[in-house]
Amino acid sequence: MNKLLFKKNKKLLIVLTILVNIISQNLLAQSKNPSPLHFPTPKNIENMVFYIQRDPNINTAIYAINYQENGKIDKSNPIKAYWIRYAEKGEKKDFSYIQRKFAYGIESKASNNEEFELQFVSYKKLPLTLKKIDSDQKYHVFVNVNQKKIQVEKIFVRIEGGSFWLPNVKYAEVTGIDASSNKTITERMLL
Protein backbone atom coordinates (compact mmCIF):
# COMPACT_ATOMS: atom_id res chain seq x y z
CA MET A 1 0.00 0.00 0.00
CA ASN A 2 2.81 2.42 0.87
CA LYS A 3 4.58 1.64 -2.41
CA LEU A 4 1.42 2.35 -4.40
CA LEU A 5 0.89 5.64 -2.55
CA PHE A 6 4.54 6.56 -3.13
CA LYS A 7 4.25 5.87 -6.89
CA LYS A 8 1.11 8.03 -7.18
CA ASN A 9 2.72 10.82 -5.16
CA LYS A 10 5.89 10.56 -7.22
CA LYS A 11 3.91 11.04 -10.44
CA LEU A 12 2.02 13.93 -8.87
CA LEU A 13 5.28 15.50 -7.71
CA ILE A 14 6.76 15.24 -11.22
CA VAL A 15 3.65 16.80 -12.79
CA LEU A 16 3.66 19.61 -10.20
CA THR A 17 7.37 20.26 -10.78
CA ILE A 18 6.80 20.53 -14.53
CA LEU A 19 3.84 22.89 -14.04
CA VAL A 20 5.79 25.12 -11.63
CA ASN A 21 8.65 25.24 -14.13
CA ILE A 22 6.34 26.23 -17.01
CA ILE A 23 4.56 28.88 -14.93
CA SER A 24 7.83 30.38 -13.66
CA GLN A 25 9.20 30.58 -17.22
CA ASN A 26 6.04 32.39 -18.35
CA LEU A 27 6.32 34.81 -15.43
CA LEU A 28 9.97 35.46 -16.26
CA ALA A 29 9.08 36.18 -19.88
CA GLN A 30 6.32 38.53 -18.75
CA SER A 31 8.70 40.40 -16.44
CA LYS A 32 10.94 41.12 -19.43
CA ASN A 33 8.01 42.51 -21.42
CA PRO A 34 5.05 42.96 -19.13
CA SER A 35 2.80 44.29 -21.86
CA PRO A 36 0.22 41.79 -23.09
CA LEU A 37 0.42 43.41 -26.53
CA HIS A 38 2.50 42.23 -29.48
CA PHE A 39 4.02 45.31 -31.09
CA PRO A 40 4.67 45.28 -34.85
CA THR A 41 7.98 46.59 -36.14
CA PRO A 42 7.52 49.50 -38.57
CA LYS A 43 8.95 48.59 -41.97
CA ASN A 44 9.73 50.61 -45.10
CA ILE A 45 8.95 53.96 -43.46
CA GLU A 46 10.55 56.66 -45.57
CA ASN A 47 13.18 58.75 -43.71
CA MET A 48 12.29 57.27 -40.28
CA VAL A 49 14.93 57.87 -37.62
CA PHE A 50 13.14 56.20 -34.67
CA TYR A 51 9.74 55.24 -33.33
CA ILE A 52 7.88 55.05 -30.02
CA GLN A 53 5.58 52.27 -28.87
CA ARG A 54 3.70 52.27 -25.59
CA ASP A 55 0.92 50.72 -23.65
CA PRO A 56 -2.09 50.61 -23.92
CA ASN A 57 -2.28 49.90 -27.68
CA ILE A 58 -0.11 48.98 -30.67
CA ASN A 59 -0.33 52.32 -32.48
CA THR A 60 3.20 53.56 -33.15
CA ALA A 61 4.58 57.10 -33.18
CA ILE A 62 6.96 57.58 -36.11
CA TYR A 63 9.69 60.24 -36.15
CA ALA A 64 11.12 60.91 -39.61
CA ILE A 65 13.36 63.49 -41.25
CA ASN A 66 11.35 66.37 -42.67
CA TYR A 67 12.92 67.11 -46.05
CA GLN A 68 11.94 70.08 -48.18
CA GLU A 69 11.11 69.72 -51.87
CA ASN A 70 14.73 70.60 -52.74
CA GLY A 71 15.93 67.52 -50.79
CA LYS A 72 17.44 69.49 -47.91
CA ILE A 73 16.35 69.11 -44.32
CA ASP A 74 13.81 71.67 -43.09
CA LYS A 75 15.97 73.46 -40.51
CA SER A 76 13.00 75.11 -38.81
CA ASN A 77 11.21 71.76 -38.38
CA PRO A 78 13.68 68.90 -38.99
CA ILE A 79 11.44 66.09 -37.66
CA LYS A 80 7.94 65.22 -38.75
CA ALA A 81 6.04 62.94 -36.42
CA TYR A 82 2.85 60.99 -36.97
CA TRP A 83 1.02 57.78 -36.07
CA ILE A 84 0.97 54.47 -37.81
CA ARG A 85 -2.35 53.26 -36.43
CA TYR A 86 -1.81 49.52 -36.50
CA ALA A 87 -5.02 49.08 -34.50
CA GLU A 88 -6.81 50.69 -37.48
CA LYS A 89 -5.34 48.70 -40.40
CA GLY A 90 -1.98 50.52 -40.40
CA GLU A 91 -3.44 53.91 -41.31
CA LYS A 92 -1.04 56.88 -41.24
CA LYS A 93 -2.45 59.77 -39.21
CA ASP A 94 -1.03 63.08 -37.99
CA PHE A 95 -0.84 63.73 -34.26
CA SER A 96 -3.76 65.70 -32.88
CA TYR A 97 -3.05 69.21 -31.61
CA ILE A 98 -3.05 67.96 -28.00
CA GLN A 99 -0.72 65.04 -28.83
CA ARG A 100 1.66 67.35 -30.72
CA LYS A 101 1.74 70.10 -28.06
CA PHE A 102 1.54 68.10 -24.83
CA ALA A 103 2.58 64.49 -25.41
CA TYR A 104 4.48 63.19 -28.46
CA GLY A 105 5.62 66.35 -30.21
CA ILE A 106 9.28 67.30 -30.60
CA GLU A 107 10.82 70.74 -30.21
CA SER A 108 14.01 71.46 -32.12
CA LYS A 109 16.81 73.98 -32.20
CA ALA A 110 19.59 74.09 -34.79
CA SER A 111 23.00 73.87 -33.14
CA ASN A 112 25.03 73.95 -36.37
CA ASN A 113 24.56 73.27 -40.08
CA GLU A 114 23.91 69.51 -39.83
CA GLU A 115 23.03 69.11 -36.13
CA PHE A 116 19.91 69.83 -34.08
CA GLU A 117 19.00 69.67 -30.41
CA LEU A 118 15.66 67.90 -29.88
CA GLN A 119 13.42 67.33 -26.89
CA PHE A 120 10.01 65.85 -26.32
CA VAL A 121 7.37 68.38 -25.33
CA SER A 122 6.25 66.05 -22.53
CA TYR A 123 9.68 65.15 -21.11
CA LYS A 124 12.36 67.79 -21.40
CA LYS A 125 14.85 65.87 -19.21
CA LEU A 126 15.90 63.70 -22.16
CA PRO A 127 17.90 65.79 -24.64
CA LEU A 128 18.28 64.21 -28.06
CA THR A 129 20.67 65.14 -30.85
CA LEU A 130 19.85 64.83 -34.54
CA LYS A 131 22.93 64.83 -36.73
CA LYS A 132 24.19 63.66 -40.07
CA ILE A 133 26.77 60.88 -39.86
CA ASP A 134 29.78 60.83 -42.16
CA SER A 135 29.75 57.05 -42.63
CA ASP A 136 26.34 56.87 -44.34
CA GLN A 137 25.53 60.57 -44.94
CA LYS A 138 22.17 60.08 -43.21
CA TYR A 139 20.62 61.71 -40.18
CA HIS A 140 20.37 59.78 -36.93
CA VAL A 141 19.13 60.62 -33.43
CA PHE A 142 21.41 60.13 -30.43
CA VAL A 143 20.72 60.14 -26.70
CA ASN A 144 22.73 59.50 -23.54
CA VAL A 145 21.12 56.95 -21.20
CA ASN A 146 22.90 55.43 -18.18
CA GLN A 147 26.23 56.93 -19.36
CA LYS A 148 25.87 55.32 -22.78
CA LYS A 149 25.55 57.18 -26.06
CA ILE A 150 22.89 55.43 -28.13
CA GLN A 151 21.87 55.88 -31.76
CA VAL A 152 18.12 55.58 -31.16
CA GLU A 153 16.05 53.09 -33.14
CA LYS A 154 13.08 52.62 -30.83
CA ILE A 155 11.66 53.78 -27.51
CA PHE A 156 9.16 51.75 -25.52
CA VAL A 157 7.17 53.52 -22.79
CA ARG A 158 5.59 51.36 -20.08
CA ILE A 159 2.34 52.92 -18.82
CA GLU A 160 0.34 51.46 -15.95
CA GLY A 161 -2.90 53.31 -15.39
CA GLY A 162 -3.18 57.00 -14.69
CA SER A 163 -5.33 59.30 -16.79
CA PHE A 164 -5.31 60.87 -20.25
CA TRP A 165 -3.59 64.02 -18.96
CA LEU A 166 -1.39 62.28 -16.41
CA PRO A 167 -0.51 58.70 -17.36
CA ASN A 168 1.42 56.65 -14.82
CA VAL A 169 4.68 56.11 -16.72
CA LYS A 170 6.78 53.41 -15.06
CA TYR A 171 9.80 53.49 -17.35
CA ALA A 172 11.09 54.02 -20.87
CA GLU A 173 13.41 51.67 -22.72
CA VAL A 174 15.68 53.03 -25.42
CA THR A 175 16.89 50.50 -27.99
CA GLY A 176 19.55 51.31 -30.53
CA ILE A 177 23.21 51.09 -31.40
CA ASP A 178 25.78 51.71 -28.66
CA ALA A 179 28.09 54.35 -30.14
CA SER A 180 31.18 52.89 -28.41
CA SER A 181 30.70 49.19 -29.21
CA ASN A 182 28.50 49.41 -32.33
CA LYS A 183 26.26 46.70 -30.82
CA THR A 184 22.50 46.77 -30.30
CA ILE A 185 21.57 47.58 -26.71
CA THR A 186 18.49 48.41 -24.68
CA GLU A 187 18.74 50.74 -21.70
CA ARG A 188 15.91 51.35 -19.24
CA MET A 189 15.18 54.71 -17.64
CA LEU A 190 12.93 54.93 -14.60
CA LEU A 191 10.73 58.01 -14.90
Annotate each PLM feature:
Residues 1-34:
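Bacterial Sec-dependent N-terminal signal peptides
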Residues 2-11, 101, 109, 183-186:
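Intrinsic low-complexity, intrinsically disordered segments enriched in polar/basic residues
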Residues 29-95, 184:
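N-terminal export/targeting and maturation segments
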Residues 47-50, 60-69, 106-108, 128-133, ...:
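Broad, structure-driven detector of short, well-ordered beta-strand segments within folded domains
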Residues 66-68, 118-122, 176:
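Short beta-strand element of the conserved SAM-dependent methyltransferase core
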Residues 89-137:
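Predominantly extracellular/secreted and cell-surface proteins with exposed
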Residues 127-170, 177-178:
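Acidic, glycine-rich flexible loop segments
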Residues 175-191:
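Short, low-complexity, Pro/Ser/Thr/Gly-rich segments in the mature regions of secreted, periplasmic
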